[in-house]
């Protein structure tokens, strides 16, 4: 993601070949083969695996039925707007630490300045030596509301947070059967979630009916769909059910649609229960919310994940507004110097014309040194000796263009300075007032919820 950001492959720019992205990433940051890099890029582009897609893929990026993506030389990609605005925002404002890459020729971010808990929204699955993690995906709107609730009351319990986060929200849909187990799972960070596919009954002509599966357990992604179709066929062939006439997979880009045509008079409820019992239409998602927190792997509760995220947001905001405040103070210093210079511009011009070098002129502006400067009068020399511009102001004066002396330009400079002072006051308030900083963070969360959230 960072490499795509650095290459300028933004959401509002043209797609670039995946091979170009993979090659650049491998050469700069990950010299361990291209397959793992491309596989990662592909997963981040698959909307059936991610709650929020991080990469906008163009071409064949695989299917929910387990078809692999086309070779990287054929596909193209770019960042999504979500990634650019929520995952990579303010990288130029010193909000995170950077470290050297493998050969110390580049800098790479140690973390990304994620503005929402991506660990909850997009989930995570993986294994390492002696440990594994499995975190389900969640709804962005619900997660944002939970984060805001924690910020308003950090004594809130996990059970109270579940007023906002009802449970997992998988890209493939599905129904959580054991909802009563969710509080314990979110409290301990471990457990098993029973998922069922969503089955609808459609009436056909002649009194016939058909079952239509529109949502599936997340665990059925890939080969699981094909296995389900085979399992249903086996139920028919082994005479365990005689109610099924035909089964077809009519899924498309619009969504899942698996149709099971039934005989007239079929026992619908009995058949649904059989499908849940004998196939993966009901399956288990194992939860183990293991994550690296403060450099150590730790199994976290729902509240702990949100707590770590909120702490990180305050760290990001503190670094961001400290950087902005520093820049505004520097700008104010320069503006004050230019405004002051305009009031004594004739004297400054006399200093410049009488100086033998830029060094002499700067010394006069900063320290009032007049020894190496020719003045028209003793009064001018006396006034010059009283000048005390800062180094930054002196540089700005020496680089100032003559058009800045126009009356309207001076007036505009004064208005600009007033705006700078307002910004300084605002940034100081944010940095010195918890409620102000929390308000800014929550405003950003609301904007992300409005733009990227879904029901």
Please describe what each predicted stretch is.
Residues 125, 131-455:
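C-terminal interaction appendages of subunits in large macromolecular complexes
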Residues 1-189, 257-259:
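Catalytic phosphate-handling regions of large nucleic-acid enzymes and associated NTPases
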